[in-house]
Swiss-Prot record:
The active site is at residue 498. Signal peptide: none annotated. Its EC number is 3.4.24.16. It catalyses: Preferential cleavage in neurotensin: 10-Pro-|-Tyr-11. It comes from Oryctolagus cuniculus. The lineage of its organism: Eukaryota, Metazoa, Chordata, Craniata, Vertebrata. GO terms for biological process: peptide metabolic process; proteolysis. This is Neurolysin, mitochondrial. Zn(2+) binds at residues 497, 501, 504. It comes from the Eukaryota. Residues 1-37 form a transit peptide. Its cofactor is Zn(2+). PROSITE patterns: ZINC_PROTEASE.
Length: 704
C-alpha cells in the first residue's frame, strides 16, 4: 500500500483519503515570508525532524498556515493582466515544496510516534492542515489566474512537465468546483472539510485500537512454542493475544481450536465497529453529494476519471470477467478445504457443520499448502531471519537498479529500532535519496504495511534538487531472547512489495513536487511494487534472501522448489477475496445508501462462497475506504495486469537480474514519477499495448 503522505501531492499510503490534495500550489516571487524557515529545503539534505513536542507541533502548524496563506494572498492579488508563468505557476510550485516538507514533520508522527500526546497533536495538525488545504485549493482568485495563464501563455515555450503541471492545475480547479457559483463552492468546501476529518478519525481509531483477548495454552492448540513464549503472560497463567498482524495471523493460520479462531476473527472484524460504522454512514453520502454537485453520477465516477480505468463500467467488466473465470477454481478449492475440515473434525471430535466459516479459511488454506506442497511456513521462516532478508533484499535492489545503499550512523530517527539509509547512483555516486526502515510493531503505530513519502525529490527554486526521502513502515514480529525476528514467506513478499514503493519514491526525478515519487494514478501506483514481488518466487533470489538463523545453512533445493511451486496454492480464493473487497468498494461509492456490512456479507456469499460472520462489519476495519483508495481498491488487481506483463515479457525473458533491463525499468517506469501518464510509461517499456495473458497465467488460468 502506498501511504500518500505529501499533502500537496498525496491522497493515506496512506492514509490518503484522509489527505486532501493540495491542488493549487504556491509561489516563488513571494518567498520572503518563508526565508527564515526555508534553510531545510537545501539540496541534498534530509531536513526532517522527529523530536517536535506537542506544543511545537501546534505552534508550527499555525505558523505554516500563516506563511502559506500570505503566499497565496500575494499570488491572488496579482493583476490578471500581469500574470506570467514565472510569477504565478512557477511561484506556486516553488513554495509548494516548503509546505510539503514542513507538513510531513507535523502530520507523520501520528503514525509512528511512541508518545500518545505527540500522536494526538499530530492528528490534530493533520486535521487543521487538511482544512487549510481545502481552503487554499478552493481559492477562486488563484484558479482564475491559472486559467488566464493557460489561455495566454505560449505553451510551446515551456517544458512538457511544466505544461502538464499547468493542465493538471486547471483540471484540479474544475474538479474542486471553482467554475461553479459561489454558493455551490462553499457547500463543496464545507463537505470536504468534514470528509477530511472523518477519514483522519477513521484511521486514527484503527491505529489506536488496543483490543486484546486472553487464552489458555490449551486454547492455543498447535501453535509453536516460540510463538507462545513471545506472548505476554497474564496473572492467571493465560496469554495476551492482540489483534496486530504478528499475533492475529499465526493464530488464524495454525491454531487447531475452532472456538479460539472464531473469537479472534470476530474481534478482528469488529474493531472500531461502532465508531467507524458511524463514520462510514456519514462519509459515503458526503462523497456522493460532492460528486453530484461537481456533475458526476457517483463518487466512483469522480475518482475514476483520473485513473487509467477511466470509468466504472470498465472496472465492473474487469472484476466480473475475472470472477467468472476464477469461479471453477474457487469451487474446487472450497471443496478441498471442506474435505480437510470434515476429516479433522472426525479425527479430533469437533462438530462438523458442513460449511467453511470465516474463521476456517486461513487455517485450512494453510493446511492445503502444507499437504499439497509439503510447505510448513513455521519451519521455513527459520530460514528467513530479518537481518538476512534485509541484507539480501537491499543487495538485490542495488544490483538490479544500479544503486548503492549505505546505512547512516547515529541517524536522527523517531524510534531507536528505526534505521536510515542513503541511496546513491552506483555509476556516478550521485545521492538520490534516503529511506527509513521501521519494521516492528509498537503501541499506537500504523498497524499495516506501507511506504510513506516524506520529502519530495524535485527541483528547488535555485535549480538544485531536493533529496527524496521515504519511510517503509511494517509490523514484523519482534525479536525475542535468543531468537531474531523470523519472517514467513508472505512477509518476505510484503517486504519486497513495500520496498518497491520506496524505490519508486527515491528513483523518480521530476521537476515538480506534485509529480514526485509515487504520485501516479491510483490504479497504476501498485504496478512497480507488484512487479518486484516476483523476485521472492525465484529460486536464486530466495537463496540470497535466506539462511537458517541458528547455523547459517541454506534452504534445501527441494524445499525451495516446493516453495516456488506453491505460488498457485489457494490462488482462486485469494483472488476472489480481492474481488469481493473491490466490489464492496465500488458498490459503496456508486450507491452510498447501502449498508456496508450487508454489502460485504452479500459479496462474500455470492463471490467467495464463504459467509461473513454475523455481527461483524469488516468495512469498518477497511482502512483503504478512508485512506486514498476510495472507489479504487480494484487497482490492486488492475495493476497486476500491467506488472505481470512487464515481468514476463522483459525480466523473465531476458533475466531477472539483468542490469540492462533493470536500468530500463528504472529509467522508463520509476524515473518519470507522475510526469507522464501511467499507460504511456507502460507502453514505452513494453513497446506495445499491455495485455492480460501473463496476469491470467499467474492466476492459474489460460489466456483466451
Amino acid at each position: 500500500m502506498i501511504a500518500r503522505c505529501f499533502s500537496a501531492v498525496r491522497g493515506l499510503h496512506r492514509v490518503g483519503g484522509s489527505r486532501i490534495l493540495f491542488k493549487m500550489t504556491l509561489g516563488r516571487e513571494v518567498m520572503s515570508p518563508l526565508q527564515a524557515v526555508s534553510s531545510y529545503t537545501a539540496a541534498g539534505r534530509n531536513v526532517l525532524r522527529w523530536d517536535l513536542s506537542p506544543e511545537q507541533i501546534k505552534t508550527r502548524t499555525e505558523e505554516l498556515i500563516a506563511q502559506t496563506k500570505q503566499v497565496y494572498d500575494s499570488v491572488g492579488m496579482l493583476d490578471i493582466k500581469d500574470v506570467t508563468y514565472e510569477n504565478c505557476l512557477q511561484a506556486l510550485a516553488d513554495v509548494e515544496v516548503k509546505y510539503i516538507v514542513e507538513r510531513t514533520m507535523l502530520d507523520f508522527p501520528q503514525h509512528v510516534s511512541t508518545d500518545r500526546e505527540v500522536r494526538a497533536a499530530s492528528t490534530e495538525a493533520d486535521k487543521r492542515l487538511s482544512r487549510f488545504d481545502i481552503e487554499m485549493s478552493m481559492r477562486e482568485d488563484i484558479f482564475q489566474r491559472i486559467v488566464h495563464l493557460q489561455e495566454t501563455c505560449d505553451l510551446e515555450k515551456i517544458k512538457p512537465e511544466a505544461r502538464r503541471y499547468l493542465e493538471k492545475s486547471v483540471k484540479m480547479g474544475r474538479r474542486n468546483g471553482l467554475h461553479l457559483p459561489e454558493e455551490v463552492q462553499n457547500e463543496i468546501k464545507s463537505m470536504k472539510k468534514r470528509m477530511s476529518e472523518l477519514c483522519i478519525d477513521f484511521n486514527k481509531n484503527l491505529n489506536e485500537d488496543d483490543t486484546f483477548l486472553v487464552f489458555s495454552k490449551a486454547e492455543l492448540g498447535a501453535l509453536p512454542d516460540d510463538f507462545i513464549d513471545s506472548l505476554e503472560k497474564m496473572d492467571d497463567d493465560k496469554y495476551k493475544i492482540t489483534l496486530k498482524y504478528p499475533h492475529y495471523f499465526p493464530v488464524m493460520k495454525k491454531c487447531c481450536i475452532p472456538e479460539t479462531r472464531r473469537r479472534m476473527e470476530m474481534a478482528f472484524n469488529t474493531r472500531c465497529k461502532e465508531e467507524n460504522t458511524v463514520i462510514l454512514q456519514q462519509l459515503l453520502p458526503l462523497r456522493a453529494q460532492v460528486a453530484k454537485l461537481l456533475g458526476y453520477s457517483t463518487h466512483a465516477d469522480f475518482v475514476l476519471e483520473m485513473n487509467t480505468a477511466k470509468s466504472t463500467s470498465r472496472v465492473t467488466a474487469f472484476l466480473d470477467d475475472l470472477s467468472q473465470k476464477l469461479k471453477p477454481l474457487g469451487e474446487a478449492e472450497r471443496e478441498f478445504i471442506l474435505s480437510l475440515k470434515k476429516k479433522e473434525c472426525e479425527e479430533k471430535g469437533f462438530e462438523y457443520d458442513g460449511k467453511i466459516n470465516a474463521w476456517d479459511l486461513h487455517y485450512y488454506m494453510t493446511q492445503t499448502e502444507e499437504l499439497k506442497y509439503s510447505i510448513d511456513q513455521e519451519f521455513i521462516k527459520e530460514y528467513f531471519p530479518i537481518e538476512v532478508v534485509t541484507e539480501g533484499l537491499l543487495n538485490i535492489y542495488q544490483e538490479l537498479l544500479g544503486l548503492s545503499f549505505e546505512q547512516v550512523a547515529d541517524a536522527h530517527v523517531w524510534n531507536p529500532s528505526v534505521t536510515l539509509y542513503t541511496v546513491k547512483d552506483k555509476a556516478t555516486g550521485e545521492v538520490l535519496g534516503q529511506f527509513y526502515l521501521d519494521l516492528y510493531p509498537r503501541e499506537g503505530k500504523y498497524n499495516h504495511a506501507a511506504c510513506f513519502g516524506l520529502q519530495p525529490g524535485c527541483l528547488l527554486p535555485d535549480g538544485s534538487r531536493m533529496l527524496s526521502v521515504a519511510a517503509l513502515v511494517v509490523n514484523f514480529s519482534q525479536p525475542v531472547a535468543g531468537r531474531p525476528s523470523l519472517l514467513r514467506h508472505d512477509e518476505v513478499r510484503t517486504y519486497f512489495h513495500e520496498f518497491g514503493h520506496v524505490m519508486h519514491q527515491i528513483c523518480a526525478q521530476t521537476d515538480f513536487a506534485r509529480f514526485s515519487g509515487t504520485n501516479v494514478e491510483t490504479d497504476f501506483v501498485e504496478v512497480p511494487s507488484q512487479m518486484l514481488e516476483n523476485w521472492v518466487w525465484d529460486i536464486d533470489s530466495l537463496r540470497r534472501l535466506s539462511k537458517h538463523y541458528k547455523d547459517g545453512n541454506p534452504i534445501a533445493d527441494d524445499l525451495l522448489e516446493k516453495l516456488v511451486a506453491s505460488r498457485l496454492v489457494n490462488t482462486g480464493l485469494l483472488t476472489l477475496r480481492q474481488i469481493v473487497l473491490s466490489k464492496v468498494d465500488q458498490s459503496l461509492h456508486t450507491n452510498s445508501s447501502l449498508d456496508a456490512a450487508s454489502e460485504y456479507a452479500r459479496y462474500c456469499t455470492d463471490i467467495l462462497g464463504v459467509a461473513a460472520t454475523p455481527g461483524t462489519n469488516m468495512p469498518a476495519t477497511f482502512g483503504h475506504l478512508a485512506g486514498g483508495y476510495d472507489g479504487q481498491y480494484y487497482g490492486y488487481l488492475w495493476s497486476e495486469v500491467f506488472s505481470m506483463d512487464m515481468f514476463y515479457s522483459c525480466f523473465k525473458k531476458e533475466g531477472i537480474m539483468n542490469p540492462e533491463v533493470g536500468m530500463k525499468y528504472r529509467n522508463l517506469i520509476l524515473r518519470p514519477g507522475g510526469s507522464l501518464d501511467g499507460m504511456d510509461m507502460l507502453q514505452n517499456f513494453l513497446q506495445r499495448e499491455p495485455n492480460q495473458k501473463a496476469f491470467l497465467m499467474s492466476r492459474g488460468l489460460q489466456a483466451p
